């Protein structure tokens, strides 16, 4: 279990690095008016975005290895610490210093994750999930994504959501998709000791590749649609929650479910959610997206907001 925790923290650090690099690389890419499959092609021309992809791959490797040593319900909540690492990157290299409420939110989120894991005590589970269970989980995830696209971009001539709401809806769908991918990674990790032939012959590898490509496009649109404050809570909160639920549903992992245990788990989980929401709205995390109450933007940020230059972002798997 100790190895799984260390590897999950390393995965979280890598995905945070990927997020920061991809935001930097996407700064000069204009937002899409609707769903644009070519957005990834434009982003691939940015060196910083490619560096973010490399960090993202590193995060995938660490996550895959962590799931080899620990349960899905243990590993995924730790990955929610990604927002803390983003906070740290921006505190060191960003133009603004953290305020006391930023540090309080970070402490609440970090402590909440640790206490939740301690009380939930995830354990057990099987290596493989049944085919019908996978089919149901995949259909539900696909339905959520399609519904999010319809709400975000409109359907049958109806106008889509506003930019902020679009970012929030797509961010939520992306977080759920990442949680589903984590479950697929868990299935794939059970074949790591069987040799390369077993890995390339299993269906979970190809499902992971397809889901990963689709989720990358979805994440790019979520972060391109509007402020990071709108999309980041969906990434940070729904990813581990979805993965934990799938760990129980698909793999039979066990968490403490007694009345007293559930009541105790609810409090730190609420702290995690509140901390993630507060950090995602802070001036440090928003960065180039100015909001009332933040200090004046530095010259570099004002230049990024000059006419014809709209900052957007794209993120991890």
What are these regions (language model features)?
Residues 1-317:
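Polytopic alpha-helical membrane proteins, predominantly small-molecule transporters/carriers
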């Amino acid at each position: 279990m100790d190895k799984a925790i260390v590897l999950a923290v390393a995965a979280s650090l890598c995905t945070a690095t990927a997020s920061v690099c991809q935001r930097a690389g996407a700064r000069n890419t204009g937002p899409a008016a609707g769903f644009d499959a070519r957005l990834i092609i434009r982003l691939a021309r940015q060196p910083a975005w490619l560096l973010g992809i490399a960090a993202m791959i590193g995060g995938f490797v660490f996550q895959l290895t962590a799931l080899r040593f620990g349960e899905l319900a243990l590993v995924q909540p730790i990955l929610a610490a990604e927002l803390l690492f983003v906070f740290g990157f921006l505190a060191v290299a960003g133009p603004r210093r953290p305020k006391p409420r930023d540090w309080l939110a970070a402490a609440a989120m970090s402590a909440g994750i640790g206490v939740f894991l301690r009380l939930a005590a995830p354990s057990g589970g099987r290596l493989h999930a049944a085919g019908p269970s996978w089919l149901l989980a995949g259909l539900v995830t696909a339905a959520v994504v399609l519904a999010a696209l319809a709400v975000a971009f409109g359907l049958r001539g109806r106008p889509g959501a506003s930019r902020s709401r679009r970012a929030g809806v797509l961010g939520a769908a992306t977080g759920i998709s990442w949680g589903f991918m984590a479950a697929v990674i868990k299935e794939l990790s059970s074949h790591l000791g069987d040799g390369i032939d077993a890995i390339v012959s299993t269906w979970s590898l190809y499902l992971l590749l397809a889901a990963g490509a689709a989720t990358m496009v979805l994440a790019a649109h979520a972060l391109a649609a509007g402020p990071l404050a709108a999309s980041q809570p969906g990434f940070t909160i729904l990813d581990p929650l979805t993965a934990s639920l799938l760990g129980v549903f698909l793999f039979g992992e066990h968490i403490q479910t007694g009345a007293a245990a559930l009541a105790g788990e609810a409090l730190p989980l609420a702290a995690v959610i509140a901390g993630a929401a507060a950090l995602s709205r802070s001036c440090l995390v928003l960065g180039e997206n100015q909001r009332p109450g933040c200090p004046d933007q530095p010259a570099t940020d004002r230049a990024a907001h000059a006419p014809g230059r709209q900052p957007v972002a794209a993120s991890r798997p």
